[in-house]
Amino acid sequence: MKLFWVKRLLRISTVVVTLLLLQRTNAAIPDCDYYDTVDISAAQKLPNGSYLFEGLLVPANLTAEYEFTILPDDSKQKVDKHIRGCVCKLKPCVRFCCPHNHIMDMNVCAGDMTEEELEVLDPFLNVTLDDGSVVRRHFKKELIVQWDLPMSCDGMFSLDNREKTDQYTLFENGSFFRHHDRVTLNKREYCLQHLTFVDGNESSIRIAPHNCLISPSRMGQTVVMITSLVCMVLTITVYLFVKKLQNLHGKCFMCYMVCLFMAYLLLLLNLWQMSQNFCITAGFLGYFFVMAAFLWLSVISLHLWNTFSGSAHNANRFLSEHRFLAYNTYAWGMAVVLTGITYLADKVVENEDWNPRMGFGGHCWICTQSWSAMLYFYGPMVFLIAFNITMFILTANRIIGVKKDIQKFAHRQERKQKLNSDKQTYTFFLRLFIIMGLTWSLEIGSYISQFNQTWSNVFLVADYLNWSQGIIIFILFVLKRSTLRLLMESIRGEGEEVNDSEEEISLENTKYDRNVL
């Protein structure tokens, strides 16, 4: 019996020891993040189990044997057994991409620095302490260099703090704050390394941060935009095919759709980096068509207001059949002027705060990370949106007033005057809201909130709404009963061309006859 219990105890002891060893190997150092550790296998081990690493005494309880590495996504990868120490609990650490004597070239570790490179190396870093003060620290003498941690990603980009958009703050605890988008990164998401900077004929080597190229999934935006482009083509085709839709308002609407199609096409090419060979040209073309689209929206807004306010005949008196030519001169001409101003500013203005910087950062568009975008792009957009909103309110107010007037007149004359139901009226307001481009006003909020991650996620809904413009317009203006009826008549050869003077709004059945009043 005693022998039985002895064997039992031995088995239990063996299991316990095995579990402890496994814990020692796999659980690693208690209360210590893997990214706060350093490989100290080559350090001197003292009799009490502690290690002497680069002049720093690492106690035994802050060391452990590892046979894995933890990747940035927190998954484990098996490696050879080695000893690691939680040295960042004892002394501030700095996360390097490569060994401390290597230099980065094209975002790749390029090997040891030469003697000449070491002579021009600036070894100091600005480190922000917990109390908010900023001190200069020698990366090797005053900090622990962590260079054996897994790289955050394959594709990285460096920051140059000479640029206002590349400012950053490195904290004593190892976290990294990127100023332009106000994002805080941990040591899994960035690393530092020596990098050559060229300024005129002189070059210098400084320690520069490298961040991952984190690109959000483009699939959702791509699917929405391609669908939107197809819907735009279908909408334009319907308006070209159906003669009754080709009145003055319909022609303006088609011009708007052409501008929108070209702007979205260039945006899609930029999204998939298919316009890099003509990036600057693509950027200015995209700017031209976006501005032209907004200008055509202002034309449509003004034309709708004239139609419903009863002042269209006054416009006819002065412009007659040349109104469409006048509209074209205004929309395309102003778009050319705005594009020309932006082009000259891009070539002449030296101050980055006033330069649109077309093509900055490989994006074939105006640099939206600075306030110059407000001057050249969002400023004109705000003005035109404000104009469209004013026209929308005046037009909606006029429609409501006309409806009430006709109802009173019909009651007085005891005539049955059936107008659209409330549902139809609300639907018309929705269509009017879309065609006047008021949904674009959300784009301003998206621009202002780009540096706030929370609000950026909120306004992502607005971005998808704008990317879906072609789909929304197709549903509201083509897939409606009156347009489908006109389309069927045209297919059967029953359609007749409508004179522009009739001022029929082809986007909606709702209208009133001024002669009734």
Curated annotation (Swiss-Prot):
One Gene Ontology term, aspect cellular component? plasma membrane
The record lists the membrane-crossing segments as 222-242, 252-272, 280-300, 324-344, 374-394, 428-448, 458-478
* Membrane topology per record: Multi-pass membrane protein
Write out the entry's keywords from A to Z.
Answer: Cell membrane, Disulfide bond, G-protein coupled receptor, Glycoprotein, Membrane, Receptor, Signal, Transducer, Transmembrane, Transmembrane helix
Which residues are modified by glycosylation?
N48, N61, N126, N173, N201, N452
From which source organism is this entry?
Drosophila yakuba (Fruit fly)
Changing R11W: reported impact? In strain: Yak_5
Name residues in a coiled coil: none
PANTHER family in the cross-refs: G-PROTEIN COUPLED RECEPTOR MTH-RELATED (PTHR47154:SF2)
Record-given protein name: G-protein coupled receptor Mth
The biological processes this protein is annotated with in GO are: cell surface receptor signaling pathway; determination of adult lifespan; response to starvation
What binding partners and quaternary form does the record give?
Homodimer.
Q: Which InterPro entries match?
A: GPCR_2-like_7TM (IPR017981), GPCR_2_secretin-like (IPR000832), Methusela_ecto_dom_1 (IPR044860), Methusela_ecto_dom_2 (IPR023311), Methuselah_N_dom (IPR010596), Methuselah_N_sf (IPR036272), Mth_GPCR (IPR051384)
Bridged cysteine pairs (disulfide): C32-C86, C88-C93, C97-C191, C98-C109, C153-C212
Q: What does the UniProt record report as the effect of altering D39N in this chain? A: In strain: Yak_23 and Yak_8
